Amino acid sequence: TALELSTKIRANRETIGAIDFDKPESKVVVDENGEVLDIVLRERGISERLIEDFMLSANEVIGEHFYWMQVPFIYRIHEEPKMEKLRQFFDIAASLGYRTKGKIEEIEPYMLANMLRKFKGEVVETMLSTILLRTMNQARYSINNIGHFALATKYYTHFTSPIRRYPYLLVHRMIRTYLFNGDVSDQTIDNFITRLPDLAESSSEYEKRAVDCEREVDRMKKCEYMLKYQEQTFRGIVSSVTNFGVFITLERSNIEGLVHIKAMNDDYYTYDQKNMLLIGRRKKKVYRLGDEVIVKVANVDLENQEIDFKILKHKSLISKK
């Protein structure tokens, strides 16, 4: 069956070390006027995963086929992670009890995939996955095939959704030209060699703009929603720690807000960048990833798309071990 085939494809991807960032996403529920009714966690069903498995496999097959045809083509490439940020990720993970084998300088996808499996299902899973994701370079389009690091594959392209993304449509045109029409003439090759670099670069740039726009709308709708809940309390998890405060992600909705260090007036806190900790100088209270908190919505700034929380209760992740 299709499900059995999908399961085998996914198992094979895990075997070769593909990295699966299965992060929870928010779903914004709006009425006919665009007013936010609710924000809930989006659930990925079996059918969605099945389609994703087949799409990934199809993209690999097309990418490899045209690589060996040695014709101008557009690939979806993904370079190795940024080493400095990767070291910080491993330091933070180690401080929480998760260590990996092997040299960071010789990083391979399977090492990161194994690390993700170590804390799968744990309270810190989403936070550590997010930090790891931020170490990654953004995938982009290029005529030079260097493989796709996160997918642990040597060949990859995008062609499965030509009705909604230009690079996919462009790949379809090349498939039609090279395969269906059998046109690999010098004129055609020269035309693609001339045009593809700019098309790949502009496609990558416009994709980045679209992602930024989507994130901005997401933040805007979350702020609109939280305006209704000022001064109300929520359960959350410490999702990031910085030198200017701690970010809290609410459990039910995945909405994130900041507790600024100026609002943490029970002590004077110093920042441990290596382990991503805020440590109280007098009381030695420590804020770290995964800590459970109860927060109050202190302020919502629609113009700057910022949500401020105030911590009412704090339970350390370490205290539960």
Question: Where are the predicted features?
Answer:
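Beta-strand/loop nucleic-acid-binding surfaces
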Residues: 254-286
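Electropositive polyanion-binding surfaces
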Residues: 1-265, 290, 296-321
